[in-house]
Amino acid sequence: MLHIALLAAVLASQPMTAEAARSQIVSEEVTFVAGGRTIPGTLVHPELGTGPGLLLLAGSGPTDRDWNSPLLPGKNGSARLLAEALAARGVTVLRFDKAFSGKNPGLPIADLTLDTYRDEASAALDFLRSRAEVDPARVFVAGHSEGGIHATRLAESRGDRIRGVILISAPGRSLREILEVQLEKNILGSAKMTPEQVEAEMVPVRTALRSFVAGQDVDPKSASSNPQIVAILSALMSPMVARIGRELASFEPAQAAAGIAAPVLVMQGGKDVQVDPVEDAGRLVTARRSARKAVDYHLSPLADHVLKTEPRSLEEVRANLQLLTTAYNAPDRTLADDLVEALAKWIRDH
């Protein structure tokens, strides 16, 4: 047993090729039950021994367990790469298809709420803790992008079962605030309008978003004549998804993160154009420090939103956002090494 532990420690400290890493891990297709529904997932673990476990929660929309999406080309999902890299470093990782993604059909969409995602994650947590490969006292949860919200809410309800929380490329602002900023900068700002014209266009948009969060029914067409803005607001406010749309738009991530009892690691990519290192990651870290709660921060200089290495400058990336997002899961792209190592070390140290 001592020899196995020593060998594992030596291997964990050495860089390895992707092929060598995969040869030392086991990947299993698994299922568990949440709310009477069978949830499919993948468990990746080292061949030998018992160690820490990590529950990995995906981001928004139809993003599946591997962080692939039918809305984006490619199948080189970052979650699969991350799970395999961490398993090669001694961490058992569970990822699963959340409601309405991958092989999980979900429930009637009008019934979808934040609690749906929390309950799925809670059942996944119990499943992970029950596995022989996992030390139940050392189980962590990591949420990517919107998944950071679900990780935070899981920690609120199941904090006694979670050793630590990792917020990866996660928002620190409410969806309402993020939408207001993005609509102003990305859509109206690219239309060659004067600052005064932009502000005049944004007043009814802000009013519509805030009225929606307050519980009022809002017609997106009353907020703007810009078809892109109407389409984005409709995706949030349509009667079919208004319930969860309102919950997401009103949720304050930094405020909620301040209440997590467990230690928190905030991870952010320097080439991320969807989540801001200051306005999002910075708010999460500041909220934790203001509440005198344990927090660590890792900024990966070359990582984009999906943790892949992005060699272009931030200015080049911002100049062609469509090229960036369509290349997220391109087959030749790899994870930022420093981010993987920092995450593995943080788990080992806790």
Regions found by a protein language model. Name each.
Residues 273-279:
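Conserved alpha/beta-hydrolase "acid-adjacent" motif
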Residues 17-53:
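N-terminal cap/lid segment of alpha/beta-hydrolase-fold proteins
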Residues 260, 266-268:
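Short beta-strand/loop motif that positions the catalytic acidic residue
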Residues 306-307, 312-350:
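Catalytic active-site module of serine/aspartate enzymes centered on a nucleophile-bearing elbow/loop
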Residues 78, 111-131:
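Alpha/beta-hydrolase active-site loop
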Residues 48-50, 54-85:
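Short, surface-exposed "cap/lid" segments of acyl-processing enzymes
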Residues 123, 127-133, 137-189, 193-194:
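Primarily recognizes the serine-hydrolase "nucleophile elbow" in alpha/beta-hydrolase
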Residues 166-259:
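Accessory cap/linker subdomain of secreted extracellular hydrolases
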